A protein has these predicted regions:
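Conserved short alpha-helical segments that host acidic/polar catalytic motifs at enzyme active sites
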Residues: 1-183
Length: 183
């Protein structure tokens, strides 16, 4: 909560939080997101009901996609291998091509963001990969532009940035806790 509040200067349109328990059932990701400031969307009663030892959050100022609740992040997808949540900062220059590839294979989009295109590609690659890390790497190789991603499966947290570091991704560690931030 406080980390998202600290990053709110980079986006005050919407925010959200997704959490998972690594000892829980496969695919058990709780999330809450909406339009508004962190203090308005992630109220104490909402946060109190979310339990997990993994989590990702996001504050948004739209550069692509409309300013609607559906576009708030993190995006959470359920698919045949479980659930994944994705928080994305950046802009892709090949979104139309990546989206068209998915549409031709039957994808139905619920947002107008390039973030959903990325999440669908990760899920699609995961179906044919041994690990979620492998799926993320395969997807990252397709992306063109500046981006930082934090992706959460029910038991793993993965951070990736564009090869040139146009969008920074910071890693912090304290004791056995890791923190990723694209700021």
């Amino acid at each position: 909560y406080y980390g998202l509040t600290s990053l709110q200067h980079r986006g005050q349109e919407s925010c959200g939080l997704a959490v998972s328990r690594t000892d829980g059932e496969r695919g058990n990701v709780q999330f809450h997101k909406d339009l508004g400031l962190v203090s308005e969307v992630l109220r104490e009663d909402t946060i109190r009901n979310m339990e997990g030892d993994l989590g990702i959050g996001h504050v948004r100022y739209s550069t692509t996609g409309a300013s609607v609740a559906e576009n708030a992040q993190p995006l959470v997808l359920s698919y045949i291998k479980g659930t994944l949540a994705l928080a994305h900062n950046g802009n892709l220059i090949n979104t139309p091509e990546l989206k068209w590839e998915l549409i031709q294979n039957g994808a139905i989009f619920h947002t107008t963001t390039d973030s959903e295109v990325i999440a669908f590609h990760v899920a699609r690659e995961r179906v044919h990969s041994k690990t979620v890390e492998e799926a993320v790497l395969k997807t990252a190789r397709k992306l063109k532009g500046g981006y930082a991603l934090v992706i959460m499966s029910p038991r793993k947290l993965i951070g990736v940035r564009d090869p040139l570091g146009l969008k920074p991704l910071c890693l912090g560690k304290r004791d056995n806790t890791y923190v990723l931030a694209s700021e």
